[in-house]
Every structure is written in structure tokens, then in C-alpha cells.
């Protein structure tokens, strides 16, 4: 198989994890007889420094021409003082919208080898934590109208709107049901229907979809209760589907109960097979250039790309199994280090995973 991958190296420590990820992809390509072509695309702080824009059209075009996009992480203190439209994170929003990616999928799973690192009580962890958050990605308050104006008394007032159309809810809701059907057949829709009209519209659309999936156990939960249940009883969840902002917050919360944000990949998909694959963590500017950042989440994101965009399940399994074997051997990066284990840096973890493929 021959595939073209757009590579966004990202900012701060991000190029370090992307470098290790490409080493792993090259190893997989060599072992299984594939060819992966890489095209560098600038976004975020790198693009701001080069072009004065977090995502110029010519860089977006590179991503649109590729079979999928691999991203490290963008942002950092250097660009924090810029206006909102010029910040690195705005490039990511444009990329998602430009690629038509409306479904972000983030697993929350505790690797058995890292269970002691979870902040949850051992008896809660022992019940098993393995759920997926399906987050609507290009609607809601992040893409609604934003306004700041001055009232008659001179006080400033800001307004952000949370628009959703039925078709936007239906397509992400259907992904939620289809994903649950392939897993343990349980779906929880998270909203705030006791307050928000958009959430009540979500419920009406989800109720219509529910009739098409009688084999999926469907429930609804307010977002504040869900935030509590994720730390109180996470084993109850299989698939959670929710709107953009709620999903952003809940998936970050869920990442912390796993013990290390450096182990969690994500995928963003639309109607076709092309997707955007990235770790959920940030660019870690405080440790940039020190060869200590954990590359595993980015490497596992590449495994998701092989599985979901390229249909290469065996190759994806090879990467995931290699990571598991490395953890079995007690090899850790600093973020999930524990007594009796061997601490390695970013390149050392890359070496260890390569050795197991």
C-alpha cells in the first residue's frame, strides 16, 4: 500500500514526538511492504513565525491533498499574547473545519501496567476503565457567533452562541450509535437539556436515531453529573457522545484518570477515510529540547491512522502490542515513572517500541 501523509510537526517539544512516530511508521512500512510519503505542513506557531498566519491556505491545501494528517501539538508561551484569530490554536480549528472533520474520538483506557499511576482508588480502577468519548468537533460555541460590546453604563459584555442544526447532531449521533454497536453496545448522550435549547434539540434527534439501534442500550446524562460519574464510577461507560465544548472538557478530565496524558491518542474523522491524528496533550514547552517528552500518544495516534483511515488493522495491532510489551518490561518515560521501572527519554522510548515491532 502507498499512502501520502501530511505531517504537522508542531511547536515546542512536538517535533520530538513526531520524529519518533515517523520512525515507527517507517518500521511498519518496511516490515509489511508499504510506502508512506510524508509532506511537511506548517500550522500553529511555526506557521505564524513563517507566514504570519496560523494556517495559510497553501498549508491547508497540503493537508487536503494527503490521505491523512499526522499532528504533534501546537501552541506555546511565545504566541500567547496574540489576538484570538492569530493564535496557534485557531489554526487547528481552521484545519478541522477545512477538512470537514466533525467527529473527534478519544479513548479513556487504563493500561494494566500503568494502573498504579491512576489517581482513582484501586477498587475503582479494578472495575476496568475502557470507554470512548465521541465529541462533535466543528459546531457549537467554538464555531458560533462571538460578540463583545459596551453597555450604556460603559461596562463591557461578551456573548458567545452555541448553534447546532439537526443534521450536525444526527451525523455525530449516528457515529455514536455505530461505535457503541461495535463495542459493548452502550451509549450515553451527555447534554444540559434542563437549561439549553441546543441540548433539547440534541435529545429530540437522538431519540429518533435510537429507534434505529434497538440493540444499543441508550441513556442520557447531564454534563455536570457525567463529570462526577467519570471519577466515581467510570466502568459504567462504554461510548459517550456529546457536543463540542462538553466533549472538550470531559475528554480532558477522562485523560487524567488513566494515569498519564502522554499515553492517549485521538482521531478526528469526517465522511471519508481521511482523518487528523494527534495526541491529546499539549506542546509541553517547559521540557522542549530535553528529550524527555513521552512520544507514546503520538505513536498510538499513528496506529489509529493505520486502522481507521488506511484499513491496516494488523499493522495497527503491531504498534499497540509493541507499546504493551515495552510497558511489560518496565520501560517508562518520566511522566509515568514508578518504582522498579527504567526511565528513558523520548528517543529511548522510540527505540524500545521499534525493537518490539
Residue spans of the language-model regions?
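Extreme N-terminal starter segment of soluble prokaryotic enzymes
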Residues: 1-5
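Glycine-rich phosphate/diphosphate-binding loop of Rossmann-like nucleotide-binding domains
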Residues: 6-23, 28-29, 153-224, 236
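Buried hydrophobic positions in well-ordered alpha/beta secondary-structure cores of metabolic enzymes
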Residues: 11-14, 67, 134, 176, ...
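Generic secondary-structure signature for well-ordered alpha-helical cores
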Residues: 26, 30-34, 65-68, 97-104, ...
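N-terminal beta-loop-helix "entrance" segment that forms/cooperates
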Residues: 33-57, 228-230
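Glycine-rich phosphate/nucleotide-binding loop
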Residues: 45-48, 231-331
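N-terminal glycine-rich phosphate/adenylate-binding segment common to multiple enzyme folds
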Residues: 49-159, 245-247
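Glycine-rich phosphate/pyrophosphate-binding loop and the adjoining helix
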Residues: 138-139, 143-183, 187-188, 193-195, ...
Amino acid at each position: 500500500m502507498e499512502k501520502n501523509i501530511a505531517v504537522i510537526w508542531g511547536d515546542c517539544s512536538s517535533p520530538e514526538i513526531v520524529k519518533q512516530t515517523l520512525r515507527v511508521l517507517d518500521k511498519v512500512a518496511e516490515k509489511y511492504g508499504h510506502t508512506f510519503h510524508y509532506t511537511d505542513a506548517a500550522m500553529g506557531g511555526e506557521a505564524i513565525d513563517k507566514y504570519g498566519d496560523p494556517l495559510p491556505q497553501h498549508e491547508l491545501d497540503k493537508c487536503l491533498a494527503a490521505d491523512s494528517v499526522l499532528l504533534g501539538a501546537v501552541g506555546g508561551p511565545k504566541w500567547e499574547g496574540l489576538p484570538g484569530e492569530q493564535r496557534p490554536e485557531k489554526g487547528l480549528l481552521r484545519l478541522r473545519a477545512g477538512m470537514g472533520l466533525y467527529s473527534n474520538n478519544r479513548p479513556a483506557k487504563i493500561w494494566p501496567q500503568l494502573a498504579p499511576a491512576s489517581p482513582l482508588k484501586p477498587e475503582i480502577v479494578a472495575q476496568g476503565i475502557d470507554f470512548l468519548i465521541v465529541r462533535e468537533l466543528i459546531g457549537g460555541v467554538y464555531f458560533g457567533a462571538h460578540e463583545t460590546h459596551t453597555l450604556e453604563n460603559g461596562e463591557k459584555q461578551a456573548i458567545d452562541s452555541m448553534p447546532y442544526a439537526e443534521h450536525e447532531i444526527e451525523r455525530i449521533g449516528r457515529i455514536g450509535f455505530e461505535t457503541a454497536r461495535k463495542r459493548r453496545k452502550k451509549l450515553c448522550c451527555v447534554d444540559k437539556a434542563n437549561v439549553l435549547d441546543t441540548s433539547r434539540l440534541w435529545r429530540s434527534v437522538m431519540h429518533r436515531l435510537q429507534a434505529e439501534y434497538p440493540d444499543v442500550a441508550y441513556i442520557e446524562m447531564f454534563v455536570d453529573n457525567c463529570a462526577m460519574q467519570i471519577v466515581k464510577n467510570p466502568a459504567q461507560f462504554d461510548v459517550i457522545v456529546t457536543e463540542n465544548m462538553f466533549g472538550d472538557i470531559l475528554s480532558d478530565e477522562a485523560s487524567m484518570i488513566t494515569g498519564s496524558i502522554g499515553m492517549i491518542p485521538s482521531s478526528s474523522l469526517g465522511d471519508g477515510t481521511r482523518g487528523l491524528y494527534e495526541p491529546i496533550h499539549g506542546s509541553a514547552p517547559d521540557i522542549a529540547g530535553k528529550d524527555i517528552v513521552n512520544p507514546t500518544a503520538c505513536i498510538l495516534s499513528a496506529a489509529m491512522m493505520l486502522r481507521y483511515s488506511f484499513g491496516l488493522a494488523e499493522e495497527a495491532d503491531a504498534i499497540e502490542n509493541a507499546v504493551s510489551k515495552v510497558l511489560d518490561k518496565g520501560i517508562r518515560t518520566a511522566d509515568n515513572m514508578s518504582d522498579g521501572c527504567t526511565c528513558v527519554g523520548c528517543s529511548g522510548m522510540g527505540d524500545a517500541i521499534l525493537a518490539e515491532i
